[in-house]
Every structure is written in structure tokens, then in C-alpha cells.
UniProtKB/Swiss-Prot annotation:
This is Fructose-1,6-bisphosphatase class 1. Homotetramer. Mg(2+) 1 binds at residues 92, 114, 116. The lineage of its organism: Bacteria, Pseudomonadati, Pseudomonadota, Betaproteobacteria, Nitrosomonadales. Pathway: Carbohydrate biosynthesis; gluconeogenesis. The gene is fbp. Keywords: Carbohydrate metabolism, Cytoplasm, Hydrolase, Magnesium, Metal-binding. Substrate binds at residues 117-120, 209, 275. It is found in: Cytoplasm. It comes from the Bacteria. Its EC number is 3.1.3.11. It catalyses: beta-D-fructose 1,6-bisphosphate + H2O = beta-D-fructose 6-phosphate + phosphate. The keyword Cytoplasm applies.
Length: 337
């Protein structure tokens, strides 16, 4: 039995500290948390419920959808469409904005989410997660349009992710620190277990898909070569390489023990500036990481400063321990000079 601060208590105390708070945001976040609990249960029981494996359909990204992609997307929608807090939703799994059904009132917030990040790993029992971001609607009470969502990451009211692994955790930021909560399944409540999470500025771990090395830009090749050179190289220390192929798992490791995660720009598909989606993955994770003392860039600019051009825009992502991110970003700027 837990004896610590529950997420419900934490959110209400946050509300009390916010001038003019009406409780709308608190209620919205509670609905998001409820969805994450339901998704955790679905992921945990996947094979028992017969929901593992792929479908014949593709999402807007051209990626083959897993059964759980569709199920978890539906859970997020059904949990959040009805309460009157939202003007609209956008999901990595849907082509366009999800309009709030006419029988429900419209609110003043926008919800953006990736319902099951890392879903390609779900069949092999590797940690996956849900990533979400909450924005203010430009016009409260009006059905949201696609352009309403195209706000820089600095405009996020809240960002978070749930990770479904050996335990289910929820990591949140409201813009003044990053906090982690662990689900106590006995009582069905998230409990504060990782207050004021901080990413070490120095690290000896880097995460990147090295099979794409031949497609990387020179600054990334240089950085990885220097890491691999170890103590006898220019960095003067040995590094370990990690790669889980689940952004939630990578970022969670970095938040708990440091490191740098890179999904850089490459020439594998010149039509794509990067692999990860700005709205659904890069912005919320950049917000979380920065609030934990880390840094997040594309190699050329701060991710949170990007002016979005589309709901499904892709960007390069380099995030984690500030010293390492600054080093890689510096190499990109040297190239551009």
C-alpha cells in the first residue's frame, strides 16, 4: 500500500497554485490518465485478449498498423471526447483532426497524442508507451481546425508520457519541472515516486540506430565516431551504445540515468526531414526533457522553437544530457558555417 502523494493530489495542488484555474484542465488530465490506465491494461493482456499482431491497414505515415495501435487510439478518443474540455484532438494514427461529436460540448483545450509509441515492439514484449501534449485552443468553444494545432512547442500547457514496462509509469511536466508517478495497481492510482527528475549533464551512453550510419550527415557521423573511439579518442572516455526502437523507453532511460538519444536527419529518404513526428513525439518529449535539465534540438535549432507546418510534420531529434546535445548541435553549426 502506498503512503506517498497521489497524482490526483499532485494535480489538485498544482491547480491551487494556478491563478484563475477553473478545474477544466485538472478534469481533462484526469481523463487522459484514465485512458493511460486502460491502455496499460490492454497492453499487459494483449496476447490473452487476442489483440497482438498487425492489421492490413496503414496510418497516415504509411506505416502498417498494429491491432493495438487502433485499439489504443480508440481508447484515447473515447476517454476524452465527452467531457467538454476539448475543442478537438489530433493523433498520429489519424489523417485529420478528430472533431468532437455534436452531442458533446466544446472546450478550450486541444489534445495531441501518439496512442502507442514503439508499437512495432509490442509483439516481442519490449516497453511501449503513450505520448501526449495539451495546448490551448485559439478560440474556446469552437470546433478546432488543423491550423489551430500548429503551435510551437513552447505553447504546450502540459506534456507527458506513460510507459508500459515492468511497471506502468506516468511522467509529466506543466512547465516547471518533470515528475514521475508509478501506478499502484492494488488501488488503481498513480503515486509520486520520482519527484523533480533531473538528467545528468554528463553521460557515457548514446542511443542511435547505427544501421543507418551510411545515411547520416557528417556531424552525426563525427560524434558517433568520437564516442566509439573511447578513452583514446578526442572525448577521452568510453561510451556504451543503446537502442530499443521505442522512443518512450529511450527517453525514460535518459531521464533516470542520463544519456543522449538521436534520430537524426539522413539521406535514406530525402523526402523526409526526419523520422519522428514534431507534434506527437518531438515536442512533448522535448518539453519533458528540457524541464528535467536536458536539451532537445534538431541539430540545427531548438525543437520547441519550431513553427509547425503540418499535423504530421517530421523532424530530426537529438535530445538528452545537455553537454552531449550541445556537442552534437555544435558540430552541425560548424558544418553550416
Amino acid at each position: 500500500m502506498h503512503t506517498g502523494t497521489t497524482l490526483t493530489q499532485f494535480i489538485i495542488e498544482e491547480q491551487r497554485r494556478t491563478a484563475g484555474a477553473t478545474g477544466d484542465f485538472t478534469s481533462l488530465l484526469n481523463d487522459v490518465v484514465t485512458a493511460c490506465k486502460a491502455i496499460s491494461n490492454a497492453v499487459n493482456k494483449g496476447a490473452l485478449l487476442g489483440v497482438m499482431g498487425a492489421l492490413e491497414s496503414e496510418n497516415v505515415q504509411g506505416e502498417t498498423q498494429k491491432k493495438l495501435d487502433v485499439i489504443t487510439n480508440d481508447i484515447m478518443i473515447r476517454s476524452n471526447e465527452w467531457a467538454g474540455h476539448l475543442a478537438g484532438m489530433a493523433s498520429e494514427e489519424m489523417d485529420d483532426v478528430y472533431a468532437i461529436p455534436g452531442q458533446y460540448p466544446l472546450g478550450k483545450y486541444l489534445l495531441v497524442f501518439d496512442p502507442l509509441d514503439g508499437s512495432s515492439n509490442v509483439d516481442v514484449n519490449i516497453s511501449v508507451g503513450t505520448i501526449f501534449s495539451i495546448l490551448k485552443a485559439p478560440v474556446a468553444g469552437r470546433a478546432a481546425k488543423a491550423e489551430d494545432f500548429l503551435q510551437a512547442g513552447t505553447k504546450q500547457v502540459c506534456a507527458g508520457y506513460a510507459i508500459y514496462g515492468s511497471s506502468t509509469m506516468l511522467v509529466l511536466t506543466f512547465g516547471h519541472g518533470t515528475n514521475g508517478f508509478t501506478l499502484d495497481r492494488d488501488v488503481g492510482e498513480f503515486v509520486l515516486t520520482h519527484p523533480a527528475m533531473k538528467i545528468p549533464t554528463e553521460t557515457k551512453e548514446f542511443a542511435i540506430n547505427a544501421s543507418n550510419m551510411r545515411f547520416w550527415e557528417k556531424p552525426v557521423q563525427r560524434y558517433v565516431d568520437e564516442c566509439l573511439a573511447g578513452k583514446t579518442g578526442p572525448r577521452g572516455k568510453d561510451f556504451n551504445m543503446r537502442w530499443v526502437a521505442s522512443m518512450v523507453a529511450e527517453v525514460h532511460r535518459i531521464l533516470t540515468r542520463g544519456g543522449i538519444f538521436m534520430y537524426p536527419k539522413d539521406t535514406k529518404d530525402p523526402s523526409k526531414a526526419g523520422k519522428l513526428r514534431l507534434m506527437y513525439e518531438a515536442n512533448p518529449m522535448a518539453f519533458i526533457v528540457e524541464q528535467a535539465g536536458g536539451a532537445a534540438t534538431t541539430g540545427y535549432q531548438r525543437i520547441l522553437d519550431i513553427a509547425p507546418e503540418g499535423l504530421h510534420q517530421r523532424v530530426p531529434v537529438i535530445l538528452g544530457s545537455k553537454t552531449e546535445v550541445d556537442t552534437v548541435t555544435g558540430y552541425h553549426h560548424e558544418k553550416a558555417a
